[in-house]
Regions:
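Non-catalytic, soluble scaffold/interaction modules
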Residues: 1-206
Length: 206
């Protein structure tokens, strides 16, 4: 109705899309804002091997890349940070399994190298900037690379709703009074500190 269409005259369409075989290559998520600091001039890209579900579930520590947006718009290649993730396993397509997917270990040599090239990092960052410019707000996006064709695809884009709501002129940091052994690492989804007991739930009835 916002576009003036009569709902009783609009016909439904069925879209048939070819599957992006990212299980044969890589996939990931990216943000047109730094999700840790709220810095708006950076694109954050995370990448893993196989289907992107493991990033969503937090099952795999991904590769992480930062690109400076203003310099990218000027035609330069401003990759300002690259970090190799562990990427010990991946999810791939399997027509014989009940869920049509299976888990596979990633070869040691592939774990130790970046899962996408600098050229692919810059292409994804360019798309992130274009998508943000189109929607006029920081965006949260998912992407996939087809292992058969080598092509990159944006498979989802939605507004980023956490850091984009913060005042960009204010940075609040929290720190622990005591330090301990680090048992897990990754990108944060918040800046505050929580505490409590850890309970291992082995069955839904518990």
């Amino acid at each position: 109705s916002d576009k003036g269409f009569d709902h009783f005259k609009v016909k439904l369409s069925i879209t048939v899309q070819k599957m992006v075989r990212s299980d044969l290559a890589t996939s990931g998520v990216m943000f047109s804002i730094d999700t840790e600091s709220g810095f708006r001039d950076a694109v954050l890209i995370n990448s893993i091997y196989g289907l992107g579900e493991y990033i969503v579930q937090g099952m795999v520590n991904p590769d992480e890349f930062y690109v400076h947006k203003p310099t990218l718009k000027q035609g330069f290649k401003p990759i300002i940070s690259k970090s190799v993730g562990l990427k010990r396993k991946k999810m791939v397509y399997d027509s014989k399994s009940k869920n049509n997917t299976k888990n596979m270990p990633v070869a040691k040599k592939d774990q130790a190298r970046f899962s996408i090239t600098d050229k692919e990092i810059l292409q994804l960052a360019t798309w992130a900037v274009q998508i943000e410019d189109h929607y006029k707000k920081p965006m949260d996006m998912e992407w996939a690379k087809d292992g058969r064709t080598g092509k990159l695809f944006i498979v989802q884009a939605r507004p980023e709703t956490v850091r984009s709501q913060d005042d960009p002129n204010v940075l609040i940091e929290y720190s622990l009074k005591e330090k301990g052994k680090i048992v897990a690492i990754g990108a944060s989804v918040g800046q505050k500190i929580g505490q409590g007991k850890v309970h291992i739930i082995k069955d839904a009835k518990n």
